[in-house]
Design a protein with these regions (language model features):
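Auxiliary Fe-S-binding modules of radical SAM enzymes
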Residues: 2-26, 177-252
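Conserved alpha-helical substructure of the radical SAM core
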Residues: 7, 47-81
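Canonical Radical SAM [4Fe-4S] cluster-binding loop centered on the CxxxCxxC motif
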Residues: 16-18, 22-59
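Short glycine-enriched, charge-decorated loop/helix-capping segments at active-site entrances
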Residues: 48-54, 145-151, 219-227
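Conserved AdoMet/S-adenosylmethionine-binding subsite of the radical SAM
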Residues: 69-73, 77-80, 85, 89-210, ...
Length: 252
């Protein structure tokens, strides 16, 4: 039974929303950007979502469900709701009741995650979701830590778990010149993931500087100042490289 009433309210910290999004999962989607992230990516376009509280609003799950139900007629057969951030798994426990209700209402769920948080709540969250968008920042462990200040070990273990339980996922890779746009690292990633059956597609995300102004507003240094955005030739070369290992590759 699809009803927006919850027996127990777990407030969720929401940073912002995007209606009719087309870049975060299949079809038209309501994208819910959640507050809080455990990574410190040098290129982060949403630095205002990192702090657990920030300028977010404590939101009742009913509010998000009602918004999803209002937009459901536009989702069609492929669309739905994507939870992004920030890092959604920071609030896994709070999200589980909402995920259950969304599924009862026949709404497709994506989770856009760095895969570095893994516990029983996250397992349940991923099990309920229809599709995981797994952000692999870098395959090389040293360069991953330089780029995010965190290890990529759990991200890779999470991918192994998704494969083992038969959960479909997409792999997303931000192509940062000099940091992740490195041929040997992409080939290592390809050799590692090339045989994964649950990996449905690879998305190359071009590096951009659209969030740089937020750093200035927050009084923070943007540490990739001077790094130029990808040229069309660089994106074509990267796609050709990924194509050697994966059957379905897109530049998003």
């Amino acid at each position: 039974m699809c009803t927006p009433v919850f027996r127990r309210i777990n407030m969720i910290r929401v940073h912002s929303y995007e209606s009719m999004g087309t870049f975060d999962g299949p079809g038209l989607r309501l994208v819910v950007f959640l507050q809080g992230c455990n990574f410190r990516c040098l290129y982060c376009a949403n630095p205002d979502t990192i702090d657990l509280k920030g300028e977010s609003k404590e939101t009742a799950p009913e509010e998000i469900l009602k918004m999803a139900l209002n937009q459901k007629p536009f989702f069609g057969k492929k669309g739905g709701v994507t939870f992004s951030g920030g890092e959604p798994t920071v609030q896994a426990k709070e999200l589980i009741p909402l995920f259950r209700r969304l599924k009862e209402c026949g709404i497709h769920i994506c989770v856009d995650t760095n895969g570095s948080i893994f516990n029983d709540d996250v397992k349940e969250l991923f099990s309920i979701a229809d599709l995981i968008l797994l952000d692999v920042k870098q395959f090389n462990p040293e360069r991953h830590k330089m780029l995010t200040e965190r290890s990529n070990e759990q991200t890779l273990r999470t991918a192994e778990w998704l494969e083992s339980v038969g959960k479909p996922f997409w792999l997303r890779y931000v192509l940062v010149p000099g940091y992740s746009a490195i041929e040997e690292d992409i080939r290592s990633l390809g050799n590692h993931f090339g045989g994964y059956k649950m990996l449905q597609r690879v998305e190359i995300l071009p590096y951009h500087t659209l969030g740089v102004h937020k750093y200035a507003a927050m009084g923070k240094e943007y540490k990739l100042a001077g790094v130029k955005e990808n040229t069309p030739e660089q994106l074509d070369a990267a796609k050709a490289l990924f194509d050697e290992y994966f059957p379905t590759v897109y530049v998003n």
